[in-house]
Amino acid sequence: MASQGTKRSYEQMETDGERQNATEIRASVGKMIDGIGRFYIQMCTELKLSDYEGRLIQNSLTIERMVLSAFDERRNKYLEEHPSAGKDPKKTGGPIYKRVDGKWMRELVLYDKEEIRRIWRQANNGDDATRGLTHMMIWHSNLNDTTYQRTRALVRTGMDPRMCSLMQGSTLPRRSGAAGAAVKGIGTMVMELIRMIKRGINDRNFWRGENGRKTRSAYERMCNILKGKFQTAAQRAMMDQVRESRNPGNAEIEDLIFSARSALILRGSVAHKSCLPACVYGPAVASGYDFEKEGYSLVGIDPFKLLQNSQVYSLIRPNENPAHKSQLVWMACHSAAFEDLRLLSFIRGTKVSPRGKLSTRGVQIASNENMDTMESSTLELRSRYWAIRTRSGGNTNQQRASAGQISVQPTFSVQRNLPFDKSTIMAAFTGNTEGRTSDMRAEIIRMMEGAKPEEVSFRGRGVFELSDEKATNPIVPSFDMSNEGSYFFGDNAEEYDN
């Protein structure tokens, strides 16, 4: 669908891939999972966690954070050069939750980063295993995408909060590499570029000198990544123009926002991978499962099978609904924050509700929250069917959508029509066709107007029974079109704050 310049699967991006065949890719991804699992087991031993405590998703998040922080070289360097009161740049840690006398207790742990790096490398046969680190970053990013709506960030860059379906990966760190770039949505790339251009407008030296050259090549690289996500010639031509601008300014920002809006109908290709918390991989490895030998894929049945047989627990606040907490984590596990809820309900086999209807806050517990009233419960992460993840945006068509999110970004390669509210989207395009790109703009608008309601995306693709490992019998779901398809529907999800 979208030529990413080089035709490499994202498993190959994930594996420094020289072209590998499917078996090699599966083994290579499996090796990465093994490493995360072994590291997690070792950390649970260090922290003296019981089996139950080791399967607590909050402990998993703390342990994942610790290793990500231990390997964050840029930040580590910054912390050493700008020492701040009460922060030891050589240490990392966080809250670990333990069950003591029938109650959950919070314990703050602190480790030398050097020690954490040693444990990580040891679990990964002496390598830095950057891919495993990126994998955990993408899991955190997917969890953020499911938990928070980035309204403020969108408004700050001059975009519209209704464009939230384009914001996948907006909290991924800069160092997340090619695998990270593959999962970023159109809006995320546009936002990064706008921030850059704004700095250039405010800071005369931003594009100048030795540093400016690096900045410029980063700018062009980001433009090319974004261009690779677009699937129409006119959208790509627009990106060439933004990239080649001598002195990027407001005209480029306008073009970028225009192209982001257009992506609500002429969707870009964004990769989706099921990245699971470390506390899923750990127990699987501990039970003797050899991911490298068996092979593993982030985009096929494997994560579904793994979740089918995993026990994960979560702390629950007094007025939260454990079923809703489960839905939040399930969606995060499958990178499905912007997928059509009707399809998700079908795959999961239970109703998937919009974010605003869920009685649950984020998975993490703040340090000032009272532990006395905390309970824990099992997260229900199993599914009825499985489906193949997609990296194409699907072709487009129209349906009434909501006040909040007005389009979807498909996660699963399954036949359906893709809802978006054409009248709302097109209203944003009235007027401003003058300016230097009018021909491209006119072409893009013409294509958007031509998008038809009856068009079906992913024709003939279906979901599969969990017993159908080779994906031989696709089941094409039928949907109740009267149901709401958007997750962030006129929503009150919390904001994401760093």
UniProtKB/Swiss-Prot annotation:
Residue segments, region Disordered: 1-21
Subcellular location: Virion; Host nucleus
InterPro entries documented for this protein: Flu_NP
GO cellular component: helical viral capsid; host cell; host cell nucleus; ribonucleoprotein complex; viral nucleocapsid
Entry keyword Ribonucleoprotein: yes
Post-translational changes noted in the entry: Late in virus-infected cells, may be cleaved from a 56-kDa protein to a 53-kDa protein by a cellular caspase. This cleavage might be a marker for the onset of apoptosis in infected cells or have a specific function in virus host interaction.
A Gene Ontology biological process term: viral penetration into host nucleus
Molecular functions per Gene Ontology: RNA binding; structural molecule activity
Span(s) of short sequence motif Unconventional nuclear localization signal: 1-18
Motif (Bipartite nuclear localization signal): 198-216
Top-level taxon in the UniProt lineage: Viruses
Keyword entries, A-Z: Capsid protein, Helical capsid protein, Host nucleus, Host-virus interaction, Ribonucleoprotein, RNA-binding, Viral nucleoprotein, Viral penetration into host nucleus, Virion, Virus entry into host cell
Family designation: Belongs to the influenza viruses nucleoprotein family.
Function per UniProt: Encapsidates the negative strand viral RNA, protecting it from nucleases. The encapsidated genomic RNA is termed the ribonucleoprotein (RNP) and serves as template for transcription and replication. The RNP needs to be localized in the host nucleus to start an infectious cycle, but is too large to diffuse through the nuclear pore complex. NP comprises at least 2 nuclear localization signals that are responsible for the active RNP import into the nucleus through cellular importin alpha/beta pathway.
Description of how the protein assembles with itself and partners: Homomultimerizes to form the nucleocapsid. May bind host exportin-1/XPO1. Binds to viral genomic RNA. Protein-RNA contacts are mediated by a combination of electrostatic interactions between positively charged residues and the phosphate backbone and planar interactions between aromatic side chains and bases.
Name recorded for this polypeptide: Nucleoprotein
Native source species: Influenza A virus (strain A/Texas/1/1977 H3N2)
Species lineage: Viruses, Riboviria, Orthornavirae, Negarnaviricota, Polyploviricotina
Gene assigned in the entry: NP
